[in-house]
Structures are given as structure tokens and as C-alpha cells.
Amino acid sequence: VDECSRGRARRWLIVAVCQVVVFLGTVTTAMLVIAVPQIISTMGLGEDGQQWMVAGYALAYALMLVPGGRLGDVWRRRAVFVSSLVLSGVAATSAALARTPVWLVLSVLVQGGALGVVSPQILGFFQQLFNKKERGRPYGLLGVAFAVALGSGPVLGGVLVDVSPENGWRLIFVANASIAFLAATLGFLLIPALTTPPDRFWWRRTDPVGVILFVVGMVALWIPMVEETARTPVLWVLAPVGALVLVGFVFWERRQANRGSPLVDLGLLRVRSYGLGALIAVLFGAYDALYYVLALYLQDGVGHSPLTTGLVMAPIAGGTAAGAVVGGRLAWRAGRRVVALGLLTSLVGLAAVMVGDLFLPTFDSPHSAALPLLFAGLGAGFVLSGLGSGLTNIPNQTVTMSQVPNTRAGSAAGMLHTGHRLGISAGIVGVSTALFATLDRTGGNWLAAFRTTLLIIAAFILVALLIALMDIVTRKEGQVR
């Protein structure tokens, strides 16, 4: 009995370690967006460099999710978990010591990729440690860690940046490195070796050709979008090259499917609920660009401090946490209808932000707004948009996975999360490009630029809402609506 009790206690210690990792992955992004204006001023980071750092982090994270999950399946999961956390800590330390923009960006990209490898290991641990009926609670605890990181990240980032006007952003990476090394140590000490030793040819089952084709194709498509502001036409040659590589990736994965070892199961896209849900996840990824443009607008446009900016952004996390709790409970009963409600609520929230923004100071008087006015003018809209985000993401994942066989659940979840992360990266690139273009066109009118970005984000969410409504109307009787 004592041995059994110790085993159960260790499971929850492992969950606690996983909470630390989820907190790390979320708080890194939340703090980083707050620090962008200071990094721009101290490191001379241009528009392209900003996109490489913020959107590049999301892209690197996304590209490593599926390969990371496969690596954990065929090799030693604990070893993958711990070594990737160590790499993340080393990359964060390197970023804190960076002396050039290229050094900083490369460090951030490595950090994002390393955390992308770590993330699917958590799902693997839970699959092995808990049965289906038990998994709800540990996943709920991960949701708590996510909400805490989302709410505290902007505030913590603001505090650290305010500590030192020149190098406060470096403290953010020091904090990230400390958390990563702590999680790696706890993981090594607490997590048992849950997988059997791999055979000599384990690497073949990671589909290395598929990984290379996928990464090269996505990066080739992504570079011209990021470097567009450099007006370098030759870079656009990479776009068709990337498209051709991705076509080759599709053919390769179909061939691998016949052999039984594809990197991604493209046949899942023919499952109606999965295909539509994955598309909604990609489109709604644009919502996360709100954090980036909001941090730039409130600091560079309106003239507030990083700490004030973090406090103003905090209500988004409260709404997201509440929406996640409610959405998780309603997902099985109301299905895609909850997703549609969440998307609609996000749109209403963005509209409320635009209305509240009308009462903020214009570009001609950037320093006259008080913190209470910011909370009153933007807070309600942020709470609503965050509530909509929580009502969208978890229910959409539940409904999207509802018709996927258990034998394909791992691949399906990896593809879904990858699509959402790619949507985040593309959204940041597209929205930030529109932001800078509007600033150039209007002579630096931040108010017009911010409203333009809100309209673009709203357009993506509107398309996702139309897809959700189409699914509700045309879904057959007996399926989860």
C-alpha cells in the first residue's frame, strides 16, 4: 500500500514539473512581447528583426512539435524532456548575453525550438501515467499554469524591464534560463524512465526525410514574409521553392503512410470534424498577434511604461482562464456551438477595444492617459476577447478530436497544435507588417495603425466563425455539434 501511495504521489510531482514547463513556455512569450520596445532601442533591432524574434519563436516552436513527439515515442522520453529543457536554458542564457541582433534572434529561435520538443513529452507522460478517466485533472492543472503565466507574464516582464532601462530585457532571459534549468533538474530526479531502451535503428522511425522537407519548406515560405520590408525581390524566389518542397513533403508522407511510419497522418484531414477544426485553429492563431501589437502600441504609441502595459494586458488572462473553465465543461454537450460562441465573443471584445480606444489620447497627446482610463477604456474589451479565446481553444480541440480513432490520437493532437502555432506565427508576421506599413503611410499615426491591426485580426476570426457556423448547420444528427 505504501509503495502504491508513493507511486501516486510521484505522479502528481511529475504533473507539478509539467506545470513548471507549461508556465515557462507561456511566460516566455508573454514577457518577451513586453520587452520588444526596449530591445529595439538598446539592440537596434529593425522591423524584420522584431518579426524574426517574436514570430520566429512561434515558428520554431511549431516546427518542432511533431518531430519532438515522434522522438519521445521512439527514444527515451525522459531524456528528450530533460535535454531539451537544458538546451532551452542554454539558449536563454545566450540571449541574455547577446551583443548583436543576429546573436539574440538565433538564441531565441533555438529556445523556441527546444521548448517545442519539450511540449509533446507532457502528453506522452500523461498517457503513460494516467488512464482516460484520470487525465482530466492533470490537464486542468496545466490549464491553471497556463492562465497564471498568461496573466503574470506581462506584469513580470514589465517589472523586470523597469528595473533597468537599458538591460532589463536581459533579466527576462535570465529568469527563463533559471526556470528551464530548475525544471530539467526536477525532471531528471522525479520522472522515471517510462519507455523501454530504443533499438539501434530508432532514428529511422522519426522519419528524418519528412522532418527535413517540412522544416525546409515552411522556413522557405516564411522568410520572404518576414524580410518583405527589406525590399529584396530575390528572396521571393524562396516562396515557390518552399511550396514545391511542401508538395514533395505531401507525396513523401503518403508513401510513408503505406509503410506505416509517417511523420504526420494526412488522412486525418479527410475526417470532417478534424479538418474543419484544424482550419479554425490555424485562423484563430492570428488572435495571439494582439499581444504583440498591443505591447508596441501602449509603449511606443501611447507612451506608457512596460509595467503599466503589463497591468493593462492582464485582464485578457482573466477572461481566458474563465472561458477555458466554462468551455471545458460545455464542450461535450454543446460542441462546435461553444466554439462559435467563443469566436463571436472574441469579435465583440475586439469591437469593445476599438470603441474604448476612441477615448484614449490621440497621437498628438501620447502621454495624457491615466491608468484608470486605460483599464476602463480597454479592460472590458480585453476581458471579453480573452473570454472568447478560452471558449474557443479548448472546446475546438475537444470537438476536433471527437471523431479521431484512439490509435491516431497522438498524431492528430500534434498536427492540431502545430497548425495553431503556425497560425500564431503567420498572424504575427502579417499583422506586424500591416502595423509598420500603416505607420509609414500615415506618418507615424499609431492610433490608425493599431485599429488597422485589430480589423485584420477580427477578419481572421470572422472567417473562423463562418466555418464553425457552417459546420453546425451541416453536421449530421448524432455527431458532436
Segments (PLM) and residue ranges:
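Hydrophobic transmembrane-helix bundles of small-molecule transporters
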Residues: 162-279
